[in-house]
Design a protein with these regions (language model features):
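Nucleotide-sugar donor-binding catalytic core of glycosyltransferases
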Residues: 1-105, 116-147
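A short acidic, often aromatic-flanked loop/helix-cap motif at beta-alpha or helix-coil junctions
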Residues: 109-115
Length: 147
């Protein structure tokens, strides 16, 4: 979906986090899931922007709302983790395999309003997280495929 060079550039800039939550996705990718997400959270979509501007907004946010798209694995989850906001997601088989990563996992979108969405919660979820663990070689080591 994205441009790896632009993603790496934004990641290297170490942008200060000054936004609590960012909401930007194409509602039509999975209309039922994503419209439910917006209805239940009470949040509004941000204005559509180009990819680099989108990544800058992701990088300056503590959390991003990341509903599933066409499947249970969404590139927004991984872009967010690489740029260090916490993706807010609903539980799925895929998310269960990544419990060691800093996701804020909701059973359903209606649970959002009772969730702790704060800078303190962000710090708690991110404690000890190193996005280098997302790199393929490190992931293979974690799975025991290479030493």
């Amino acid at each position: 979906h994205g441009d790896q060079e632009v993603l790496n550039k934004i990641a290297s800039e170490k942008i200060e986090k000054d936004n609590l939550i960012y909401v930007n996705f194409d509602i039509n990718t999975n209309y039922i899931e994503r419209s439910t997400c917006l209805e239940e959270t009470g949040l509004e979509l941000s204005e559509k922007v180009d990819y680099e501007s989108y990544l800058r907004e992701v990088a300056r946010s503590h959390f991003i709302l990341s509903p599933n798209g066409n499947g249970i694995d969404c590139h927004k989850h991984w872009e967010a983790l690489y740029l260090n906001p916490v993706p807010i997601v609903t539980n799925s088989i895929n998310i269960q395999h990544h419990k060691h990563l800093p996701f804020l996992i909701l059973k359903e979108w209606r649970d959002f309003k009772e969730s702790d969405i704060s800078e303190a919660k962000y710090a708690s979820l991110m404690k000890g997280f190193n996005n280098e663990n997302l790199f393929f070689q490190n992931y293979c080591k974690e799975l025991g495929w290479i030493k």
